[in-house]
C-alpha cells in the first residue's frame, strides 16, 4: 500500500497534532467553596481509626468545620460558550444556598456524587470530573463518563 500525499487540505472532525489523529474532548471548569460542618461517626469507634497512637483520627467522629473546595470539569461540545462557566458556577452555588444540595455529614465522595446528580440533569449527556476537598488539602476526584450509546 502506498501513502497518498497531497497539498490539498484535509478536514477531519478530530484534530491532527504532530501528524497523529487524536480524539479531542473539551472541558470547562468552575470552582467554588462552601463552609460546612461534618463528622465521620465511625472514626470514634473503629479500631483501625481510633488507634490511640500517632495514626489516631478518632477526633473525626465529632462535628468539625471545613471550607469545602469544589472543582467541576464539564465536557463542552464547541468553543463558543456551549456552557457559560460563570453562569454554571452561580447555578451550582445556588443549589447549596437554596438547600437543593446540602453538605450535612457527608464525605467528600458523597458530596461529589450529589453534585454530579444535579449537574447531569442541568447539563445532560456530558462527561464530568468533580473534585471535593476539605480546606483544599485532602479530598476526592471522581470521573463520570458517559457510556457509548446511552
Predicted regions and their residues:
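Charge-rich, low-complexity N-terminal segments
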Residues: 1-150
